[in-house]
């Protein structure tokens, strides 16, 4: 029925393929958009590649960056040294490289496929994983229950380790969990092992519980040890990095909070304002606090910020800034404090806590807050004693135009040095003179026996008269000595130059005088010259007249009678035992004696002061009588030799010819007190030591020639042939006649005298040729010292102030002071003091501070610039008291020692002391030791004293001045006027061994 009702379609035999309707519709159709096609089009899923597209930026083992080796099958990356095993650049494979974990997994897959083919389980082995139930069924057949538990536990560990790092995981690799286990994927493939196929293989593998863990560790990539999350710090401290959100990392547009809409800090309505200035972000960008809702401008903070903070930032309204701002606080303490103040604190809680603390009557633990004390220094007891017992102040030294002004006449405190108790005794004088005479005679006999011809001796016996003429200097005041210890009634002013030696005084002795008497008288004169100055700087000193002491004469010198003394008006009987004989000014070795003092060269400030170059007069001396013993007569034979060696070192002192009653005038010191031989000026040397011109008859007086020329003659060694010939020729002609004929002199002698005269006229321009005269070596020890001083430049000079002894140059970095013979400055040469030690002090130069310092060694102390430096005699307390047992033992020992001392007979205990034991000590100017000024505690200052130019140093009662040459050699501004007066010539004429001028602006 239905078939009948179906209509039949009419089929037309038309060709519709060639119609134009489709083309017409295509032309009339509206344009199509591509969006619909894109939406409808499904993205074609790319096939998964075997390796990862990106690898980690840090090493999976040490979590550090650098040159990394990337795995081609997983995102792991390693350093060459972090691989397992470590690799080198030469060991890198040319193709793909797989890490240790991927290599183990690949081997396991290959083993699984091979086992599947053997057992006919190829389909099962092709699957990646099997269900846990199937594994359990297989294990039930071959393993026990304990083995199943171990496998289940291993599977749980495997899943925990492989969760964050699986290829299908969408978690970011930057999370803390992924940093720990980022590439762990299927570490233990228990599911993939064909357990059923090899039941015997599984059973021994699970015998021990740690075997499975060891197997899992062998299959993992090497990693460094890391603490678990439970032990790491998770507190968000200020300054830590912020964790970015997923939307920020992916770049997707996510709805943000109102105050974070703009990246530049611009916040739209509702407006957010700054907490400090209440202005919006239109003024400047706002900074949001990460711990509270407050915002701030960068310029409103204190101190202002220069850039936006990168990490977590905490605003200044938090109390954590005060609590966490401690230097010695550990991380755990910071975390505890931060967690404590993280929540808001109720104001009522603060009030209640305050009230509870106030109303507590008996608090369990009351802590008394100690007041903060100011930092203070403990003043040493030595400094306290200096203020309690201050030493006497130094007399103010007058300083004018940068020059030190002092008084020429000694003070009352120094007058004791001129008393007779400090002079040598008669026995000492006789012993000294006898030893000097014996030494000189032995030297002369030795030289004469070797090289002196015999005809000189024959000629000496034929000659009888000796008429030496001595050039005297009226500027030096000396005295006469008498044999019976009584002064002569008449007084004569006698002037003796420093060149007169002991032989000249001996030659004037009377014929009937005994040798012993002569020795005693002459030795007393020589010793007096050591102990007392021949003349003071600004005038004579009124001293006590004794038998062998100095005697002053006031009569003018207008007579030249050979029977009289120089300048005498009253004739003296030649054979009388009371006749006075001229006292020698200095002994031959006076330059090296300890207490000898020569006159100080000074520049007086009065225009009408005494002249330093007085006129000279010729004083004849009686001839030597034939009754003089040979020991004394032989001394005169060495007069020429001693004039050359001794007189060249002894300078004539200058004295003031004013009367004793005249008031002392202040003088400006130009040179310090020098030893014998210092203080010869160039201006006076040309007048005093020049050889006189010959007379009309061609004769020259021998005394004038020997004294005037021998002062600057360069010395020769004692065994030199030229020296012996010169000595013999001069002695022969001087002993025979009173005058010398130039025609009779030797040619070598004439050349020598001419050369000596040239040296006097041109001392600095003309140098003697070494081949013409001989080697210019020095005969005396003092001259050798002078040569050494020329070679080594002095750093500083140590000057005495009491007028005794000479200045000592500090040529090296240290200068030792004391009474010992090995000291650089022997204090016995500068006077007597009972409170000085053998090694008293040391002056040294510190290379680091570039200063001179003095270190005291003596128990008596040293005063530097009115500050006492001494030893610390205070009792030192032990740092810790002894224990009870030790104290008991010590008390028993002490008691036993006292019992032994009581039983033994009392004896005087020997004590070491720097003071001399035995005879009574000589008095000195010290009232007591300087250590008595320390105080009751006995704590002296043992530090070093800083020395400046002009520092005043006092050792007992001996006073010195320390002068630095680099300051002393600087000339002041007022030297331009001194050039006109000729004073500069005197300064430049100082000898090299003379100390520099005490003149500087830094004198304290």
Swiss-Prot record:
Q: A cellular component term (GO) from this record?
A: nucleoplasm
Any single GO molecular-function term of the entry would be: zinc ion binding
Q: Which residues bind Zn(2+) 3?
A: 274, 277, 297, 300
State where the PHD-type zinc fingers lie: 56-105, 271-321
Q: Where is the composition biased (Polar residues)?
A: 641-650
State whether keyword Ubl conjugation applies. Answer: yes
Q: Which InterPro entries match?
A: FHA_dom, PHF12, PHF12_MRG-bd, PHF12_MRG-bd_sf, SMAD_FHA_dom_sf, Zinc_finger_PHD-type_CS, Znf_FYVE_PHD, Znf_PHD
- The record's region (SIN3 interacting domain 2) falls at 328-364
According to its UniProt record, where is this protein located? Nucleus
Is the keyword rRNA-binding assigned to this protein?
Answer: no
Q: Where is the FHA domain?
A: 815-869
Instruction: Give the binding site residues for Zn(2+) 2.
Output: 289, 292, 315, 318
Q: Which residues are in coiled coils?
A: none
Modified positions (Phosphothreonine) in chain numbering? 557, 570, 671
Q: Where is the composition biased (Low complexity)?
A: 166-179, 908-917
* Cross-link type Glycyl lysine isopeptide (Lys-Gly) (interchain with G-Cter in SUMO2), residue numbers: 467, 900, 973, 987, 991
> Per the record, which residues fall in region Disordered?
28-59, 113-142, 154-187, 234-257, 530-580, 641-673, 895-923
* Region ranges (SIN3 interacting domain 1): 202-241
Q: Where is the composition biased (Basic and acidic residues)?
A: 32-59
Tell me how this protein assembles: Component of SIN3 complexes. Interacts with SIN3A in a complex composed of HDAC1, SAP30 and SIN3A. Component of the SIN3B complex, which includes SIN3B, HDAC2 or HDAC1, PHF12 and MORF4L1; interacts directly with all subunits. Interacts with TLE5.
Comment field on protein domains = In the context of the SIN3B complex, the PHD-type 1 Zinc finger delivers the H3 substrate to the HDAC active site. The atypical PHD-type 2 Zinc finger has a structural role raher than a substrate recruitment role, wedged betweem SIN3B amd the HDAC and stabilizing the SIN3B:HDAC2 interaction. Also interacts with SIN3B through the SIN3 interacting domain 2 (SID2). Interacts with MORF4L1 through PHD-type 1 in a SIN3 interacting domain 1 (SID1)-dependent manner.
Q: What's its job?
A: Transcriptional repressor acting as key scaffolding subunit of SIN3 complexes which contributes to complex assembly by contacting each core subunit domain, stabilizes the complex and constitutes the substrate receptor by recruiting the H3 histone tail. SIN3 complexes are composed of a SIN3 scaffold subunit, one catalytic core (HDAC1 or HDAC2) and 2 chromatin targeting modules. SIN3B complex represses transcription and counteracts the histone acetyltransferase activity of EP300 through the recognition H3K27ac marks by PHF12 and the activity of the histone deacetylase HDAC2.
From the Swiss-Prot or TrEMBL record, give the protein name. PHD finger protein 12
């Amino acid at each position: 029925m239905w078939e009948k009702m179906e209509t039949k379609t009419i089929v037309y035999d038309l060709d519709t393929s060639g119609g134009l309707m489709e083309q017409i519709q295509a032309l009339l159709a509206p344009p199509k958009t591509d969006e619909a096609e894109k939406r409808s089009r499904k993205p074609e899923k790319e096939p998964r590649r075997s390796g990862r597209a990106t690898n980690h930026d840090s090493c999976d083992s040490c979590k550090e960056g650098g040159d990394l080796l990337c795995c081609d099958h997983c995102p792991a990356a390693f350093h060459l040294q972090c691989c397992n095993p470590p690799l080198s650049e030469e060991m890198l494979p040319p193709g793909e490289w797989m890490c240790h974990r991927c290599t183990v997994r690949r081997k396991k897959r290959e083993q699984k496929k091979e086992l599947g083919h053997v057992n006919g389980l190829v389909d099962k082995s092709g699957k990646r994983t099997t269900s846990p139930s199937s594994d359990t069924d297989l294990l039930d057949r071959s393993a026990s229950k304990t083995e199943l538990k171990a496998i289940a536990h291993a599977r749980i560990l495997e899943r925990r380790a492989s969760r964050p790092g699986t290829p299908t995981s969408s978690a970011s690799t930057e999370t803390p969990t992924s940093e720990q286990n980022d590439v762990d994927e299927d570490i233990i493939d228990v599911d993939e092992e064909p357990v059923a196929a090899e039941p015997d293989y599984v059973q021994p593998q699970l015998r021990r519980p740690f075997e499975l863990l060891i197997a899992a560790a062998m299959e993992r990539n090497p990693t460094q040890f890391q603490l678990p999350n439970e032990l790491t710090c998770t507190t968000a401290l200020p300054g830590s990095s912020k964790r970015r959100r997923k939307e920020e990392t992916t770049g997707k547009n996510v709805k943000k909070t109102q105050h974070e809409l703009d990246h530049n800090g611009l916040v739209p309505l509702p407006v957010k304002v700054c907490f400090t200035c209440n202005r919006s972000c239109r003024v400047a960008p706002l900074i949001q606090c990460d711990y509270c809702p407050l915002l701030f401008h960068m310029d409103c903070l204190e101190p202002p910020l220069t850039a936006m903070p990168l990490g977590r930032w905490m605003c200044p309204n938090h109390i954590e800034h005060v609590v966490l701002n401690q230097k010695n606080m550990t991380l755990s303490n910071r975390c505890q404090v931060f967690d404590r103040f993280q929540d808001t604190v109720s104001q009522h809680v603060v009030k209640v806590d305050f009230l509870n603390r106030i109303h507590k009557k008996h608090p369990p633990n009351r802590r008394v807050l100690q007041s903060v004390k100011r930092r203070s220094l403990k003043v040493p007891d030595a400094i306290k004693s200096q203020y309690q017992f201050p030493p006497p102040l130094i007399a103010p030294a007058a300083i004018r135009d940068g020059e030190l002004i002092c008084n020429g006449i000694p003070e009352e405190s120094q007058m004791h040095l001129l008393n007779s108790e400090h002079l040598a005794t008669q026995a000492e004088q006789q012993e000294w003179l006898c030893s000097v005479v014996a030494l000189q005679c032995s030297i002369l006999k030795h030289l004469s026996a070797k090289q002196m011809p015999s005809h000189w001796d024959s000629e000496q016996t034929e000659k009888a008269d000796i008429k030496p003429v001595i050039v005297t200097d009226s500027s030096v005041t000396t005295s006469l000595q008498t044999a019976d210890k009584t002064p002569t009634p008449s007084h004569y002013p006698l002037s003796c130059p420093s060149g007169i030696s002991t032989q000249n005084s001996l030659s004037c002795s009377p014929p009937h005088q005994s040798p012993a008497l002569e020795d005693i008288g002459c030795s007393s004169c020589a010793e007096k010259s050591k102990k007392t100055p021949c003349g003071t700087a600004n005038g004579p000193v009124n001293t006590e007249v004794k038998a062998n002491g100095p005697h002053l004469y006031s009569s003018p010198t207008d007579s030249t009678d050979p029977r009289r003394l120089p300048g005498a008006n009253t004739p003296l009987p030649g054979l009388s035992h009371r006749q006075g004989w001229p006292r020698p000014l200095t002994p031959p070795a006076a330059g090296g004696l300890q207490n000898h003092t020569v006159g100080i060269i000074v520049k007086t400030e009065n225009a009408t002061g005494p002249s330093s170059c007085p006129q000279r007069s010729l004083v004849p001396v009686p001839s030597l009588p034939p009754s003089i013993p040979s020991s004394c007569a032989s001394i005169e034979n060495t007069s020429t030799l001693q004039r050359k060696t001794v007189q060249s070192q002894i300078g004539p002192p200058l004295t003031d010819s004013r009367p004793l009653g005249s008031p002392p005038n202040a003088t400006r010191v130009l040179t310090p007190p020098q030893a014998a031989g210092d203080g010869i000026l160039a201006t006076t040397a040309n007048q005093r030591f020049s050889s006189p011109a010959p007379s009309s008859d061609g004769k020259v007086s021998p005394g004038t020639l020997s004294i005037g020329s021998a002062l600057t003659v360069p010395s020769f060694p004692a065994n030199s042939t030229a020296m012996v010939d010169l000595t013999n020729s001069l002695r022969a002609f001087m002993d025979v006649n009173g005058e010398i004929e130039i025609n009779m002199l030797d040619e070598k002698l004439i050349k020598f005298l001419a050369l000596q005269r040239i040296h006097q006229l041109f001392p600095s321009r003309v140098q003697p040729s070494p081949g013409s005269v001989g080697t210019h070596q020095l005969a005396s020890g003092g001259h050798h010292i002078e040569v050494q001083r020329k070679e080594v430049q002095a750093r500083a000079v140590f000057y005495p102030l009491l007028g005794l002894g000479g200045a000592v140059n500090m040529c090296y970095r240290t200068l030792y002071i004391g009474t010992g013979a090995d000291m650089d400055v022997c204090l016995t040469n500068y006077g007597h003091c009972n409170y000085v030690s053998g090694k008293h002090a040391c002056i040294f130069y510190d290379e680091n501070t570039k200063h001179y310092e003095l270190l005291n060694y003596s128990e008596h102390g040293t005063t530097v610039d009115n500050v006492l430096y001494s030893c610390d005699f205070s009792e030192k307390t032990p740092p810790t008291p002894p224990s009870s047992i030790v104290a008991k033992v010590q008390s028993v020992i002490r008691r036993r020692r006292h019992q032994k001392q009581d039983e033994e007979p009392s004896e005087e205990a020997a004590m070491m002391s720097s003071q001399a034991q035995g005879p009574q000590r000589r008095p000195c100017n010290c009232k007591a030791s300087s250590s008595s000024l320390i105080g009751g505690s006995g704590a002296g200052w043992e530090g070093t004293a800083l020395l400046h130019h002009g520092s005043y140093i006092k050792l007992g009662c001996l006073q010195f001045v320390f002068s630095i040459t680099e300051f002393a050699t600087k000339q002041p501004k007022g030297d331009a006027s001194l050039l006109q007066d000729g004073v500069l010539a005197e300064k430049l004429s100082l000898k090299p061994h003379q100390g520099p001028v005490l003149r500087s602006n830094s004198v304290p």
